[in-house]
Amino acid sequence: MIAVDTNILVYAHREDSPFHDTALRRVAELAEGSAMWAIPWPCIHEFLAIVTHPRIYAPPTPLDRALDQVDAWLESPTLAVLAESGHIG
């Protein structure tokens, strides 16, 4: 399983990124493919914080558009969101 980090999510989303085309193509391949892939929950939080921050991007991505992007990723039937389980041992 491939886990996608924050920077790849940001590059795939932000058209002004020099890595946009490559990242977008790779995330689309994962989302549309048959193999399981993952996004760690903290990376979703980081993605939202980064792309909507006005000191990082001018203009920043509007929150509703950033949330729509997250929703689109979450619609992939092969996506697993990685989070702490609370299970110890």
Please describe what each predicted stretch is.
Residues M1-I39, P54-Q69:
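Short, well-structured N-terminal submotif of metal-dependent ribonuclease cores
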Residues E15, W41-H45, D71-G89:
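Acidic catalytic patch
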